[in-house]
Amino acid sequence: MELAFRESLKKMRGTKSKEKFSQELEMSRSNYSRIESGKSDPTIKTLEQIVKLTNSTLVVDLIPNEPTEPEPETEQVTLELEMEEEKSNDFV
């Protein structure tokens, strides 16, 4: 998991010990420690428990790794449609 998530998790845990927080999440301290240290990713169920326990909101965002460009076939179809529209507008 990203550093921002781990830092947020530590901040939300506040002054509670890892032992206490993991008990409230109904998981072992070692499993919680692996999540907080970034050695393991939490399950959706665990994320839901963290949200409930910390009265927070979970935001998931999908960001492409690199810009996606339309396939050449898609560009061709788009160009053909534009040409057809221009032709039909010429007759109006």
Swiss-Prot record:
<dbReference type="GO" id="GO:0006276">
    <property type="term" value="P:plasmid maintenance"/>
</dbReference>
<feature type="region of interest" description="Disordered">
    <location>
        <begin position="63"/>
        <end position="92"/>
    </location>
</feature>
<dbReference type="GO" id="GO:0003677">
    <property type="term" value="F:DNA binding"/>
</dbReference>
<feature type="compositionally biased region" description="Basic and acidic residues">
    <location>
        <begin position="1"/>
        <end position="27"/>
    </location>
</feature>
<protein>
    <recommendedName>
        <fullName>Plasmid copy control protein CopR</fullName>
    </recommendedName>
</protein>
<keyword id="KW-0238">DNA-binding</keyword>
<keyword id="KW-0614">Plasmid</keyword>
<keyword id="KW-0804">Transcription</keyword>
<dbReference type="InterPro" id="IPR010982">
    <property type="entry name" value="Lambda_DNA-bd_dom_sf"/>
</dbReference>
<feature type="DNA-binding region" description="H-T-H motif">
    <location>
        <begin position="20"/>
        <end position="39"/>
    </location>
</feature>
<feature type="region of interest" description="Disordered">
    <location>
        <begin position="1"/>
        <end position="40"/>
    </location>
</feature>
<dbReference type="InterPro" id="IPR001387">
    <property type="entry name" value="Cro/C1-type_HTH"/>
</dbReference>
<comment type="function">
    <text>Involved in copy control of plasmid pIP501.</text>
</comment>
<keyword id="KW-0615">Plasmid copy control</keyword>
<dbReference type="Pfam" id="PF01381">
    <property type="entry name" value="HTH_3"/>
</dbReference>
<feature type="domain" description="HTH cro/C1-type">
    <location>
        <begin position="9"/>
        <end position="62"/>
    </location>
</feature>
<keyword id="KW-0805">Transcription regulation</keyword>
